[in-house]
Curated annotation (Swiss-Prot):
Keywords: Aminoacyl-tRNA synthetase, ATP-binding, Cytoplasm, Ligase, Metal-binding, Nucleotide-binding, Protein biosynthesis, Zinc. SMART domains: DALR_2. It is found in: Cytoplasm. It comes from Granulibacter bethesdensis (strain ATCC BAA-1260 / CGDNIH1). The lineage of its organism: Bacteria, Pseudomonadati, Pseudomonadota, Alphaproteobacteria, Acetobacterales. The keyword Translocase does not apply. Belongs to the class-I aminoacyl-tRNA synthetase family. This is Cysteine--tRNA ligase.
Amino acid sequence: MPVDFVGIPAQKADMNQAAFFLYNSATHGREPFRPIDPKHVKIYVCGPTVYDLAHIGNARSMVVFDVLARVLRRLYPRVTYARNITDVDDKINARARESGVSIDEITARTTADFHADMASLGNLPPDIEPRATAHIAEMILLIEKLIAQEHAYETHGEGEGHVLFSVASDPSYGSLSNRSPDELLAGARIDPAPYKKDPGDFVLWKPSADDQPGWDSPWGRGRPGWHIECSAMSWRYLGEDFDIHGGGGDLIFPHHENECAQSRCAFPGSHFAHYWMHSAMLLLDGEKMSKSLGNVLTVRDLLGQADGEAIRLLFLKTHYRGVLDFRYEALKEAGKELDRFYRALQAHPALPDLDETVENPVLEALRDDLNTPQALSLMHGLAYAALGGDALAAAQLKEGGMLMGLFTREAEAWFQRGINPDEIAQRIADRLQARKDRNFAEADRIRNELAEAGILLEDGPSGTTWRRAS
């Protein structure tokens, strides 16, 4: 039985008692999802720090929570999905110094790049996308609450202008990441500071030099710490308690642990997020991506080599809690799988209406902790049936794929992606003329040239048609 997490009763999962099951990182177990208000589900997901292009590990997490939002919208009448933009951070400051470009220009450009990349992967925009710099007032108010309740303290002397959270004031600190006090201290020793009462105390507010971004506050001109930003923005838009908090697994400690502590302590009696979801790490050819290894692959780079829908499908083939080992061979295979899916849909241009009282088997799989591998397996079965003439299976395939953000275009558009139909039509006309002139060598050369480009010609009674090679 999973342990209780800060007063929230741990639930035993029973498929007969609940419609939707999630793995809750807070209780370290799979549980039935029971929203605070079944009429309005609220989600908060940690978004990007906008100093550089998103890499494929970032993108995987965003795809996971896009699918979550889509499924929740299918199951509940109203969903509010908030995902922040961190536009004040020391990494942004450093990038501005290195590049000689203003912070505003860097954050604006990188935010636009992020939006474009996410759209290319089929992600819908969140309902709310707050920027940290637009919520400094809420952060200051939250810090004042923590000081008033003796969960935070202002420093003087050497650390003048800092406000720190006191981890000793929160008996539940460490419960989210399931870390012992010794483990927490070991992490804190990486960057000790003499003005801390406890090595594990973390920054809520810090002073800014003249050349750094800063805002006036009761503690002098300064800027917020990383963790307080998300606490303030989730509070502003979702309230003291909300349903689901998501992010990458690398954020569990210290970011989510600290976020959770701040919010619980600022609002006594609240639970903050009732469910915590985390996507696992992504490896690149078996190795962890890192700048020191020089193997960080950005979404933008990958989109230059593959279609965004194929990248999305590849992400979904591994369960979100499983480590995904990204390999180019697997990406190519994902493209072929999409060919098959779209071929099945293309065979049924007019899809029948589905019986709303009969649940799509794909949705049934997604109810089980977003089991996307199982959902895709079922979709392959539906595609097989659709290719055999089953129009109902084709309709279920289309609906199931859209639940996962797939099939966002018509089949014809998928097969013609990256292709200029006018150029192909001209080459077909050239080949036809060569055949009329009995220049069969030239006709064969044109056919072979198109085949090498992935275009197959098919001669029939009504003329020559073409299709993309599977």
